[in-house]
């Protein structure tokens, strides 16, 4: 499983669900999520899922246990720490070289935004240093022992997270398409996870991706394409064809945990009823409060849902008083997703800590 969370904190959850590490409960394993927007994964509902997954996993042989990995880009400094800790155990000389490379980030006090702003003002960045550490880790052969192979994989993806985070924050402050950088990083993580899982099990790897519709749908069927944006769902379809199955989630009304702006405290909002004529409104008009639709291969559904309609997207920020402008855009759901899940009324998650 790949979730829209950072690599390092999610890897702690992965160790817990696999019966590894020192955490004694799912809530403790989730306690690493301290930064905004921590409630997205540090909540009671995800905690309960993690506990159930651990119980299931412990009844399986190690190679069949389901992992939970982070695919997002907001992880430079914790990921660098993980790389250095791994190299120190397996190759102290490589660890020393990597530490020298990562000193490039040391003046920014573990604040990625400060690095991005500084890189914008200078012709110098830490791009080459981050790439050099990726090469250091890549030189270490992948162990045959499943547990050691898992640790090696974690180091590989941690090094990639440093490089991905460096590129993302440098791009954000340069005014370029940072969205594309982020979703391309997600795609590399998902493909890396699939390859790793396949190597462990001896079968083609399967990854369930858990993220917002804006990442998991196909951007070519949305207004985002007009802005030159791509996304994870699009990349998976382009690279893997029908092996990628994209599922969207829709709700008409309910409550949601969000913040009024990035970095501010979260609160529970009443989610406004969906706008007339939007996809969620059309789904509600069926009179069925919860259902799923398989769009792929269903020509009648594709015909009925093929015209562009408004589609709502609520992420970690919610602005109900300017909802039409900030949370709706045109989309063609029949091209965006292979399936859609609709629940008329949804409830907010329960934040922990």
Q: What positions do the PLM features span?
A:
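Structured catalytic-domain cores with a bias toward divalent-metal coordination
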Residues: 1-353
């Amino acid at each position: 499983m790949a979730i829209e969370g950072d690599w390092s904190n999610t890897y702690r959850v992965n160790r817990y669900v696999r019966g590894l590490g020192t955490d004694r409960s799912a809530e403790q394993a989730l306690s690493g999520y301290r930064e905004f927007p921590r409630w997205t994964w540090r909540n009671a509902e995800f905690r309960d899922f993690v506990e159930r997954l651990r119980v299931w996993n412990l009844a399986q042989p190690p190679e069949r246990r389901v992992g939970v990995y982070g695919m997002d880009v907001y992880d430079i400094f914790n990921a660098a720490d993980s790389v250095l800790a791994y190299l120190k155990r397996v190759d102290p000389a490589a660890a020393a070289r990597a530490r020298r490379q990562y000193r490039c980030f040391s003046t920014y006090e573990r604040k990625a935004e400060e690095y991005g702003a500084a890189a914008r003002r200078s012709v110098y960045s830490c791009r080459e240093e981050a790439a050099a550490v990726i090469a250091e880790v890549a030189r270490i052969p992948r162990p045959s022992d499943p547990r050691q192979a898992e640790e090696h994989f974690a180091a590989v993806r941690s090094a990639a997270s440093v490089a991905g985070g460096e590129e993302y924050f440098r791009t954000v402050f340069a005014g370029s398409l940072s969205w594309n950088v982020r979703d391309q990083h997600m795609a590399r993580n998902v493909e890396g996870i699939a390859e790793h899982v396949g190597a462990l099990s001896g079968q083609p790897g399967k990854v369930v991706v858990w993220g917002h519709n804006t990442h998991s749908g196909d951007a070519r069927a949305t207004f985002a394409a007009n802005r030159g944006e791509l996304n994870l769902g699009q990349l998976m379809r382009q690279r893997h064809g029908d092996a990628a199955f994209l599922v969207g989630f829709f709700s008409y009304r309910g409550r949601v945990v969000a913040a009024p702006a990035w970095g501010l405290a979260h609160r529970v909002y009443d989610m406004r009823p969906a706008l007339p004529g939007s996809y969620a409104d059309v789904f509600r008009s069926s009179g069925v409060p919860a259902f799923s639709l398989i769009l792929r291969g269903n020509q009648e559904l594709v015909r009925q849902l093929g015209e562009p309609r408004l589609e709502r997207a609520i992420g970690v920020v919610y602005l109900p008083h300017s909802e039409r402008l900030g949370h709706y855009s045109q989309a063609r759901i029949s091209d965006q997703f292979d399936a859609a899940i609709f629940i008329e009324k949804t409830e907010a998650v329960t934040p922990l800590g």
